[in-house]
A protein has these predicted regions:
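Helical mechanochemical/support elements of P-loop NTPase systems and associated helical scaffolds
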Residues: 33, 64, 93, 122, ...
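A contiguous pocket-lining binding segment that forms or flanks enzyme active sites
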Residues: 134-179
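Phosphate-binding/switch region of NTP-binding enzymes
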Residues: 170-212
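Conserved beta-strand segments of the P-loop GTPase G domain that flank and frequently precede/overlap
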Residues: 54, 84-85, 113-116, 139-143, ...
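Short acidic, S/G/P-rich loop/turn micro-motifs used as interaction or catalytic elements
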Residues: 57-60, 88-90, 119, 144-149
Length: 212
């Protein structure tokens, strides 16, 4: 079985190889695709910072992940996306599906997927990835409210993002918002998705509330 040290060493090797690739965009904001919302946010969401996405309840966890992936696509047009996922998400919702990710708009070839058993390991891997200047976005998924994910941990992620230019998205399920260094905080619920012409399920839809 791969140890935590081995997993982190493998991630460091991957990030070192990525550093020889495409650098992330230098634009300070990325658009959400809605002019009214972008305007209210001063041009969109800021890159090189930490943003939190909370599921309204555990049942809405897949929607929170989908919304976070949509933000990652917006933030990262071409650079790699590092997705660090606590294994609890796989157990509850199933593993990521390549064709579904592609249908959402993210080329699976740009995705580096890291699975970790504990929240502490997720934070370590996410922090390591956030320090790599060749990464576009880091998506970190953590279940519950572990003690290791405190204000200090969020500050470390925020500072790493600011130093490297990487955008960090933290998806939280079965957790209540608490003090953090996040620039924005969202709450996500599933919404009805229906094609107006056929009445069949259409594009992914989310009910989103900007908490901060």
């Amino acid at each position: 079985m791969t140890t935590r040290r081995d997993a982190l060493a493998a991630l460091k090797g991957t990030l070192a190889r990525l550093e020889r690739g495409v650098m992330p965009s230098a634009l300070p904001h990325f658009s959400l695709g809605l002019p009214e919302l972008d305007g209210a946010l001063g041009g969109g969401l800021t890159r090189a910072s930490l943003h939190e996405v909370f599921a309204a309840s555990p049942a809405h966890g897949p929607s929170a992940t989908g919304f976070a992936l949509a933000l990652a696509i917006r933030a990262t047009p071409s650079a790699p996306v590092v997705w660090v996922r606590q294994r609890m998400f796989d157990q509850e919702f199933g593993r990521p599906y390549g064709h579904g990710i592609a249908a959402l708009g993210l080329d699976p070839g740009r995705l580096v997927l890291v699975r970790a058993r504990h929240a502490e390991d997720v934070l370590k891997a996410a922090l390591e990835a956030a320090r790599c200047t060749a990464v576009g976005t880091v998506l970190a998924e953590i279940w519950g409210s572990p003690k290791v994910l405190d204000l200090t941990a969020s500050r470390r992620l925020s500072l790493a993002a600011a130093a490297s230019g990487v955008t960090v998205l933290a998806t939280r399920v079965d957790a209540a918002p608490a003090a953090s260094a996040a620039t924005s905080r969202w709450q996500v619920r599933a919404a009805v998705s229906q094609d107006p012409q056929t009445g069949l399920p259409g594009l992914p839809a989310f009910s989103v509330t900007l908490l901060r």
